[in-house]
Amino acid sequence: LEMKPSIDASSYWGLRGRETLGETGYVRFVLESGFEGDTGRVANDTRSGALFSREAMVVLGREGTGEIALGRMAGFLGSTGTYAQWAATGMNPLASNAPDAALAGVFQSSPIMDNAIVVKSAPMHGVTLLGQFSNSTNQATYPESEGFSNTEHLYALAAGWKGENATALLAWQMIDYANTANGAQPHNAKPTHNIFAGASRGFGDLRVHVA
C-alpha cells in the first residue's frame, strides 16, 4: 500500500491579476506553480524546481469578442489549465484526474507547453472556438535557439458547446516532433494526430458520457 499526493488533482498556488481597458477590453496575467502536498516539491514540470511551471501567461481580450493568450500553458486535451477543454466541457465522467478514472487513462492528453499562443472566441449560441500553437513545447529539451526544425511544435483546434443540460467537444491536436532523436522518438519521426469527440447529457440524476 502506498499513498501518493496529487493523483486526483494537483495542489497549486499562484498569482492572478486583471486590469480593465476601456469599457469592454481587459488584460490579465496568470502565474501558477504546482507542488506535491506531502513534500512541497515543485511539480507539473520535468525541470526540477521550475517555478510557475503550471501556467505563466498574459491574456489580452475584449468582452463579447474573445481573447489571445501568450506564454506557458496546457493544451486542450486535459483538465489542467485555463484552456483545458475536458474540464471546460465536463468530459471527465468521474470528475477526476486519476488515470484509472479519467480520460487521460484512455485518450491521448496534451502537455504543458512553453512558447504557446491561444486564440479563444467568446461563446456564440453556446459554441466556443479555440486555436493553439506552441513553437517549442519544452525549452529545456528543445531550445528555441536550435531552429524551427529542431524543436517540437504543437498545433490544435477545438470547438466546445454548452447547452442547458448537455455539453459536447470536438478537438484536434498535432504534435510535430523535433528533427532530432529524443528518447522514444527517432530521427525524423512523423507527426502524431489526435482527434477527440465527446458529449455529455444529464437525464435527471443520471448523466451519460460518450467519447
Model region roles, listed by residue range:
Residues 118-120, 128, 138-139, 197-200, ...:
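Non-transmembrane, interaction-prone segments in cytosolic or luminal domains
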